[in-house]
Amino acid sequence: MESVLDAFDQYLALERGRSDHTRRAYLGDLRSLFAFCNERTPGADLGSLTLPVLRAWLSAQAAAGTARTTLARRTSAVKTFTAWAVRRGLMASDPATRLQMPKARRTLPAVLRQDQARDALDAANSGAQQGDPLALRDRLIVEMLYATGIRVSELCGLDIDDVDTSRRLLRVLGKGDKQRTVPFGEPAEQALRAWLTSGRPALATAESGPALLLGARGRRLDPRQARTVVHETVGAVAGAPDIGPHGLRHSAATHLLEGGADLRIVQELLGHSTLATTQLYTHVTVARLRAVHDQAHPRA
């Protein structure tokens, strides 16, 4: 089964342009499904993937308390896999065509207040004052994620040539291999120049290639390491929610809208394919307005 999963992984990467994060999640979902099938029928193969089995697997996941968003992703993983397997001749028919996608409950994303974002950035800047290469890199990670709102996978995928420091622009390769240009401000530029001048040269090795961000051993930075950096930096801010890079992306979008940015401009900056995804952030700003109103207005 692993050889089939390897071929499916190649399909996701080369033909569908899925990120490393999505591919890992999909393969993990499918391994969970295959383990479920083997528990029911030892030695089960792809022919064991029937609609009742798929429904039973999802029902077991739901009974175990799996979140709706995760169930929706697992359903998507299965539907993508079985459709691919039929096209490859690995399955005679697609059992997932009638498998319904659980409706994910749309919840407001956790975001930082502007003062909390400022405190997190100040903490990252303070840690970089001694010139330690990793501290300079960590400062750049936090500054650039908040300044641009790009995804952590997009940040870690940047090469040096993707950065126009003088014009303060990033050339970002997003989902579906769609390229967009994203601006950043002076604080992020300062963090970038410090990293390129003093941080990156100290970590670079023959294996670094053109990668902008590097790990401690000189290789391209893994998004999981960047997530750890963000969690630790934001976690040091009193009262701040526990967020990672995606939370900084949410925060950047929310603060742009609070500052009066046009919704379609924010959509372009974030690389959303539809405006509906970006509109979720308008609910965050409305929720904040209502909270302030309820607290401050005498007739609330």
Swiss-Prot record:
Q: Which InterPro entries match?
A: CB (IPR044068), DNA_brk_join_enz (IPR011010), Integrase-like_cat_sf (IPR013762), Integrase_catalytic (IPR002104), Integrase_recombinase_N (IPR010998), Integrase_SAM-like_N (IPR004107), Tyrosine_recombinase_XerC/XerD (IPR023009), Tyrosine_recombinase_XerCD (IPR050090)
* Single GO MF descriptor: tyrosine-based site-specific recombinase activity
Domain Tyr recombinase per the UniProt entry, residue ranges: 107-294
Q: What does the record give as the active site?
A: 151, 175, 246, 249, 272, 281
Classify the source by domain of life: Bacteria
Is Nucleotide-binding given among the entry's keywords? Answer: no
**Name of the gene:** xerC
Domain Core-binding (CB) stretches: 1-86
Q: Which GO terms describe its cellular component?
A: cytoplasm
Gene3D superfamilies this protein is in?
Answer: 1.10.150.130, Intergrase catalytic core
Biological process terms in GO annotation: cell division; chromosome segregation; DNA transposition
Question: What's this protein's family per the entry?
Answer: Belongs to the 'phage' integrase family. XerC subfamily.
Annotated function: Site-specific tyrosine recombinase, which acts by catalyzing the cutting and rejoining of the recombining DNA molecules. The XerC-XerD complex is essential to convert dimers of the bacterial chromosome into monomers to permit their segregation at cell division. It also contributes to the segregational stability of plasmids.
Subcellular localization, as worded in the UniProt entry = Cytoplasm
Q: Which UniProt keywords apply?
A: Cell cycle, Cell division, Chromosome partition, Cytoplasm, DNA integration, DNA recombination, DNA-binding
- Main localization of the protein? cytoplasm
A Pfam family of the record is: Phage_int_SAM_1
What PROSITE patterns does this protein map onto?
A: CB, TYR_RECOMBINASE
Q: Assembly and partners? A: Forms a cyclic heterotetrameric complex composed of two molecules of XerC and two molecules of XerD.
Q: Respond yes or no to whether keyword Metal-binding is given for this record.
A: no
Please give the name of this protein: Tyrosine recombinase XerC
